[in-house]
């Protein structure tokens, strides 16, 4: 798992990583820096790998590079959620990431540009954030998309970043203004359609 994510995002950004399973019913996992916390129910779930990938991805997106402001929380959760699909794409030959994202895009998600405290950790922030990243990947192509991701992680390591700073980086590496695309995916109501 670590090998796959480092191939996508760049070197693991911290000194250590571990996981702790507790005998409690939390109903969620938590990505504390260098140590993910899972409850027993999640650890025994058939989708435990998805939880593990999500929390491991947070070591890059959330722990090493964190959202500058709470309104940018989609950067942490969108990247970690998209990592779940990237993991499947790399480890399951039958997985079609475009079909999966199209299926997800058929659902209704509220705008996430500034979700506010009551909606900060809703599915909209996680899933629409992942869809925004997939739309960016479609638009700029794999080579540029993963260059954006790796550069974001490298330049922002042990720091923070904002949506505007990600847009500026993506625009620089793509050689054109990516802002309108990203802003549509974060703010438009209804949400845009995926192009592939």
PLM regions: where:
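Extracytoplasmic/secreted proteins, especially bacterial periplasmic and envelope-associated proteins
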Residues: 4, 33, 47, 51, ...
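Structural helix-adjacent loops and short alpha-helical linkers that scaffold large soluble proteins
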Residues: 10, 90-96, 137-145, 171-179
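A short alpha-helix capping/helix-coil boundary motif
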Residues: 26, 38, 111-114, 145-148
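Histidine kinase transmitter module recognition
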Residues: 41, 155-158
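Non-catalytic accessory/interaction domains
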Residues: 57-60, 110-111, 143, 158-196
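Acidic/His/Gly-enriched intrinsically disordered linker/tail segments
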Residues: 71-140, 150, 156-157, 183-188, ...
């Amino acid at each position: 798992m670590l090998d796959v994510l480092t191939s996508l995002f760049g070197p693991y950004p911290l000194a250590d990583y571990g996981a702790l399973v507790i005998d409690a019913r939390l109903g969620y996992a938590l990505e504390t820096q260098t140590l993910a916390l899972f409850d027993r129910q999640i650890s025994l779930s058939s989708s435990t790998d998805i939880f593990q990938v999500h929390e491991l991805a947070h070591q890059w997106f959330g722990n090493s590079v964190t959202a500058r402001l709470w309104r940018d929380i989609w950067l942490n959760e969108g990247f970690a959620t998209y990592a779940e699909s990237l993991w499947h794409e790399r480890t399951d030959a039958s997985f079609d990431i475009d079909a999966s994202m199209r299926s997800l895009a058929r659902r209704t998600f509220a705008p996430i540009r500034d979700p506010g405290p009551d909606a900060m950790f809703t599915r909209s922030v996680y899933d629409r954030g992942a869809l925004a990243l997939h739309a960016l990947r479609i638009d700029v192509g794999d080579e540029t998309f993963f260059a954006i991701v790796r550069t974001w992680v490298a330049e922002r390591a042990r720091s923070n970043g904002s949506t505007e700073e990600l847009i500026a980086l993506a625009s620089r590496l793509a050689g054109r203004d990516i802002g309108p695309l990203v802003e549509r995916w974060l703010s438009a109501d209804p949400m845009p359609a995926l192009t592939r």
